[in-house]
């Protein structure tokens, strides 16, 4: 640590922060012009450049967000109204006035002091700050860009090599967890591990998959292109406690989103209109939703967009649109599984279902559990449990045991409308033919009478292609497509 800065007249600046700034200013000799030009002309532009050099690790301007960001307590935060950056500019002005007294040449000292005195006028500072937006510009995509970094209260954890280091403003992290990490890799939370055993009813395969899935959610990438559904028909089954604990622990990295984000029925927005929910998901890792009576069907297009890893373009209110690569994993909690009208969600394995069959009876319920799990020492242990889950994920991926996979198979079959239609209204018949158009019309009548979603003709034919085992072949006759080996049942 260098000594505190001492001025020519013997004044010692005992604040380490301001002392370091004075040393930096003195090393730059901003008053020099001509042959020994410092590069900082005696103008608002020059002062904007000098301010940018001194505060580049503390203040940045993002044009897409129309906002300044300032760095404090290990994270970059939006500076609403440019309040904090304006205070930094005031500090800068005071430091420059102190520096004027350090200039050896009398004439230059007087002239430079006269120039710096003008910065006492707020209007001049406003102009300097406006010029500094270019000096300190940052693109929105530069924030939270590293998918392996997790910013804790006391430092940054790197999933690439499982190391922990001091905060670095050059990481440009705007997110931060709600706990301070410990360097003890063996730290654990026994109560959390007991809770996991309880909600999985001692099923080690399910507990292991849950740990790997939650560990995978720490990673800011969409490698697996999937979402997770926690399904429990009973009440008091632990789903909310699990998700709420992870949300609290991850802090800024977690977001509770409306279920309309992934369901049909949500109002379709004009692509040019604001999409604040989507915009708010940039940089998030853990996005949770709860079922709603308003929505009952998953929207395959939305889910494919949000889980596919492709760029998302969104616009917050009163801001310009930004494009970002999703870093989040979707988690849906529900008592009743939502309907799925597009079987491709199952074929592409985008849906992972984890059943919560435990029901905590009144005498088994711990009303203090959520608060207990969210204590600092317990969140540290839970975080390392997730890290160990990430390590397991790196080794074994998201492979599911047969029992876990059977849950998804049952879910798929219960939503297979074409198969249900065939079983109820059709039968195999060797050599029989039916027009594809007539078969689709029969399906529409069946779907409407059963209150089911009516697939488009294109999707219906695609599903029939997937169920090629239900008929002999598909052919054309006089330009009309036919299905061979199938006929309609007689309804009595």
PLM features: residue spans?
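Modules that initiate DNA replication and primer synthesis
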Residues: 1-34, 66-97
